[in-house]
Amino acid sequence: MIVAVGSTNPVKVEAVRRAFSLFWEADVRGVDVESGVPKEPFGPNAIEGARNRARNALRALNADFGVGIEGGIFHLFGKYYCAGFVWIERKDGVHSTGMSGWFECPEAFLPDMLRGRELGDLMARLSGNENIKREEGAIGFFTRGAVKRVDLYTHGTLMALAKFIAAGRWPR
């Protein structure tokens, strides 16, 4: 089975590899595709970006599954949260979605993010690590490595895989 990930970010590719390998033998490949949304998407834009990445990756590699992971900012109950939205689409058009765990977005970052700055850029400045979004991520920095970005995205991918894992047990 070929699984196309709509990103070459090693964190996203590894998260998908970890999730799929729990259930199937999968050849997981990252491919550079367009998300069609702003670099730091808010709310529905993150969902749209994940969908676009999954579909574009599926087509680009003629894969069995396409996976799009889009980190974004979500506003609920008066606060902003960072999370990863995951869209998985099978080659027959059936899709499923999931999300990673959420964590509160630092309020100090919000003015810059609302103007289009990416969380990864702000974290690079704060941490001194220019590659933080391709490594531990903001959550890894803030939890001192207890939870890493790959963990969040593996969790989100598993949530999106539930429909496919359940197969005949998924209610119609």
UniProtKB/Swiss-Prot annotation:
UniProt binding sites for Mg(2+): 34
Range of residues in the leader sequence: none
A biological process term (GO) from this entry: nucleotide metabolic process
Origin superkingdom: Archaea
Keywords (A to Z) from UniProt: Hydrolase, Magnesium, Manganese, Metal-binding, Nucleotide metabolism, Nucleotide-binding
Cofactor(s) listed in the protein's UniProt record: Mg(2+); Mn(2+)
Protein name from the UniProt record: Probable inosine/xanthosine triphosphatase
Organism the protein comes from: Korarchaeum cryptofilum (strain OPF8)
